[in-house]
Structure formats: structure tokens, C-alpha cells
Amino acid sequence: MARRRKGRPINGVILLDKPTGISSNDALQKVKRIFFAEKAGHTGALDPLATGMLPICLGEATKFSQFLLDSDKRYRVIAKLGERTDTSDSDGEVVETRPVDVNLEKLEACIDTFRGESDQVPSMFSALKYQGKPLYEYARKGIEVPRESRKITVYEIILHRFEGDEVEMEVHCSKGTYIRTIVDDLGEMLGCGAHVTMLRRTGVAKYPYEKMVTLEQLNELLEQAHRDEVAPKELLDPLLLPMDTAVEDLPEVNLKAELTNLVQHGMPVQVLGAPEGTPIRMTSGEDKLFIGVAEVNDDGKVAPKRLVVFRDEE
């Protein structure tokens, strides 16, 4: 007897405005339950303290979440000068207090050093793993383990406000950039220490800020559906963005029906002018139905790598 799946095969991306105080995984599970989705995955964790854009992939969209993990991010951050914490944010314990002797000129000069490419050593309080365990598990036990530095790029860092011991900045950066680490490093450069008191992710890839929805809004729609005696999906599903928005920056190859059929059975196909050396977004027919991601193989053919499996709700 076939195992009955729990949840429905709904596909798409919801742009959640994550609230402060909960983990990204907790937020993911709440969204999964609200949509009664069979599968769900987020696209890069936010700290419990942080709020803002957390794209959550549902169903077949989870196959393409890696492309969002690898995408650029934008943040708004407020830092408090004069105090350093063990987590580099206000959720941690203050480990050092120093007087703040910083003027605008010195602050701007220090901020300028973060622009461009650099090597960043991740915080011990991060989800990166060492010998199979997240770093934060070691950190909570007071154990320091070696971490390799990673190449990051800060495309833009803008100082919006400097008042007393508070600094507010906007950062546009590459994947894997820890804003807490930037703030901690900035505090050390200034000689007074610093930690994050507010962090909000305002952008992931090219997703529009105004498309974000809160857990409260989703729960209200769920309650409204129950009051109106309609299926929750009638009110919730229109909020979903198409799953190919996760790969919209990839070059497109449009396939006719015959080639589509071959690709959907895992067969490489010959496509004139297909771009090499990059993942390819495959669409089918005049409607340009998204069917998956491919790469050009050594034979010069478009070889499917991740395919969308289309299933109807039971």
C-alpha cells in the first residue's frame, strides 16, 4: 500500500517577513502548517533577533532554493557602540564595555574598509558546522573551534545615522556574509567594541520588498477562510510567487513539445545556441512553462539537472 503523503503538493515561493524572537526553522514550520504544504524549505537562515525577508520555497520550488542561498542580500542594521557581546548581538551577554570616542570622520573611514572583497571569519554563534555540529552548539559550551575564513563581497555599505552610541547602516552583500561579524569587527577598529541591536533583511536576489507577508497576515487569511467556509488555499495560494522566480536570473532555453518530453525523461537534447558554463532555466512551449534547470554537458547538449515534477492535488 502506498504511503499517504502528509500535506498537499503546492508549489511556489512565499516571501515571509520573519518576526523577531523566533528561529528561521520555527518560521518555516509555521508557514508549512498554514499552507498545509507537503514540502517546505527556507533559503538562508536569519538569526532569531533578525526580522525581514525570508523566502520560503514550497513543494517543487525547494529543488531550486540553492540559487536563492547563493544570491545577494540586503540588510538594515543598528549597532550599539561601547559594548561587545559574546554573540555580537543583543541576545548575548556583554563581555566588554569601553568608552566611545568616535567622530564621524573616523567612523566613515572605518566603514569604508569593509567595501569590496575580503576574508571574513564566521562568528562562533553561527549555523555553520564543524565535525557535523553547528558552531553555536560549541559556543554555548564555551568551546572555541577553528573556522576557515570565507571570501565575501560588500557591494555597498551606507551610513544612514550616527547618534551618540548608535550607528545605523545599510549593507548590500554577497552570500555568506555575517552582518554581526562586520559590526563586531567595526567596533574593534573603532576601539570601543560594538554589537547588533536591530537587524532587518530587506532584500534577497531581486524579490520585491512590498511582496513580503507576515505570519499574522497568513493566520488572518486562514481564519477568514474558516469564517467564510471556503478552502484556505483560495485565499492563501494567490500570495505565492512562481517557483521559477528563484532562478529568474539564469539564461533561458525554450523547448518545443518533443524536446520537452525527452528532457522530462532525463535525456540530454541538442539546442542551438544554448549558453555554456552556466545553469540554464528551461521553459516549454509558447506559454514558457518552467520545467527545470539544466547545464550544457561535454557533448554540447542541454542536460537536465533538476526537473519539476507536476502532480495534481488528490
Curated annotation (Swiss-Prot):
| SUPFAM superfamilies registered for this protein in UniProt | Pseudouridine synthase, PUA domain-like
Enzyme Commission identifier(s): 5.4.99.25
Q: Which InterPro entries match?
A: PsdUridine_synth_cat_dom_sf, PsdUridine_synth_N, PUA-like_sf, PUA_sf, tRNA_psdUridine_synth_TruB, tRNA_sdUridine_synth_fam1_C, TruB_C
- Where do the catalytic residues lie? 47
Q: Which reaction does it catalyse?
A: uridine(55) in tRNA = pseudouridine(55) in tRNA
Q: Name one GO molecular function term.
A: RNA binding
One Pfam family from the record: TruB_N
What top-level class of enzyme does the UniProt entry assign? isomerase
**Entry-linked CDD domains:** PseudoU_synth_EcTruB, PUA_TruB_bacterial
Under PANTHER family, the record lists: PSEUDOURIDYLATE SYNTHASE TRUB1, TRNA-PSEUDOURIDINE SYNTHASE
HAMAP family the record matches = TruB_bact (MF_01080)
Q: Which family does it belong to?
A: Belongs to the pseudouridine synthase TruB family. Type 1 subfamily.
Name recorded for this polypeptide: tRNA pseudouridine synthase B
Organism from which the protein derives: Vibrio campbellii (strain ATCC BAA-1116)
What's the encoding gene here? Answer: truB
